[in-house]
UniProtKB/Swiss-Prot annotation:
First and last residue of the signal peptide: none
Sequence segments annotated as region (45 X 2 AA tandem repeats of G-[TA]): 49-138
Region (Disordered): 46-134
Cellular component GO terms held in the UniProt record: chloroplast
Name the record gives this protein: Period clock protein
Keywords: Biological rhythms, Chloroplast, Plastid, Repeat
Compartment(s) where it occurs, according to its Swiss-Prot or TrEMBL record: Plastid, Chloroplast
């Protein structure tokens, strides 16, 4: 649908031509205000989302430990000894003697012990995750200006409207 055709200019005066151009610009701006007040002005949309994911990983580790233990043992030994003695006697007499002896013995024993130790280990793991996101966008009003100029049939004005509306929409939507 095109706006009213206000281009039939009377060649008798330049003032009327300029006045009609001002009126057309004003009506076009009113049309944009009316157009933007409805929800269907956002017929174009874009989506951009970010998501966070969770993952699981497995790892292996090595550790070292030290321990101390105590043990008790029992042993048995045998020994041998030799002795010498001297004695004197008279008639029916009595004698006394002394002797000395030495002996050696050996023994063996067994024992048990317990100990405790500590160790540390390190491991690595990998995980994957997925995420979703949503976004919204607005329609580019420059397309409406282009359509309006196309209906008017003015190639030069169409180009000017297209450039101006592009910068206008870009600055407004930043």
């Amino acid at each position: 649908m095109c706006l009213p055709f206000f281009t039939s200019i009377n060649s008798s005066g330049l003032f009327k031509a300029v006045s009609w151009r001002i009126i057309e610009s004003f009506l076009l701006e009113l049309f944009f205000i009316f157009y933007s007040s409805f929800s269907w002005s956002s017929s174009l949309s874009s989506s951009e989302g970010t998501g966070a994911g969770t993952g699981t990983g497995t790892g292996t580790g090595t550790g070292t430990g030290t321990g101390t233990g105590t043990g008790t043992g029992t042993g048995t030994g045998t020994g041998t000894g030799t002795g010498t003695g001297t004695g004197t006697g008279t008639g029916t007499g009595t004698g006394t003697g002394t002797g000395t002896g030495t002996g050696t013995g050996t023994g063996t024993g067994t024992g048990t012990g317990t100990g405790t130790g500590t160790g540390t280990g390190t491991g690595t793991g990998t995980g994957t995750g997925t995420g979703t996101g949503t976004g919204t966008g607005t329609i580019w009003e420059g397309e409406l200006v282009f359509f309006y100029a196309e209906c008017k049939g003015y190639p030069k004005i169409k180009g000017v409207f297209w450039v101006v509306s592009f910068f206008y929409d870009t600055a407004k939507n930043v």
